[in-house]
């Protein structure tokens, strides 16, 4: 099965909304148990989406960002893992082997981005100082 451009766009919108939820709303739409069925619905295989989302939820159930430790990015991991399971027809436990490396790699990128942005924030604070004008 191939993913159409419209389906890829819909998955991107789902990832965007889930990312907003993860950092702002915390309605838990970013959890795999919710994202898996949504990906399955978009790709036309709700059953595999539910099974893969549930399996990935078991993998990431107890992970929480505490202090400086950041867990793998569950959003990208779930979307990539579920899409992989649906498009290739593999079992959900095989999708875990694909989802986890993607989740770790994306979280490393996000941590790097946040580290770079921390240096920019002091410059932004200086630029908004009204006495500087």
Swiss-Prot record:
InterPro entries attached to this UniProt entry: PTS_IIC_man
Main location: membrane
Cytoplasmic topological intervals: 1-2, 54-65, 115-133
Keyword set includes Glycosyltransferase: no
A UniProt-annotated Pfam family: EII-Sor
Transmembrane segments: 3-23, 33-53, 66-86, 94-114
GO BP annotations, alphabetical order: phosphoenolpyruvate-dependent sugar phosphotransferase system
Keywords, ordered alphabetically: Cell inner membrane, Cell membrane, Membrane, Phosphotransferase system, Sugar transport, Transmembrane, Transmembrane helix, Transport
Periplasmic face of the membrane: 24-32, 87-93
Comment, domains: The EIIC domain forms the PTS system translocation channel and contains the specific substrate-binding site.
Function recorded in the entry: The phosphoenolpyruvate-dependent sugar phosphotransferase system (PTS), a major carbohydrate active -transport system, catalyzes the phosphorylation of incoming sugar substrates concomitant with their translocation across the cell membrane. This system is involved in N-acetylgalactosamine transport.
Protein name: Putative N-acetylgalactosamine permease IIC component 2
Naturally occurring in which organism (per UniProt): Escherichia coli (strain K12)
Upper lineage: Bacteria, Pseudomonadati, Pseudomonadota, Gammaproteobacteria, Enterobacterales
Originating gene: agaW
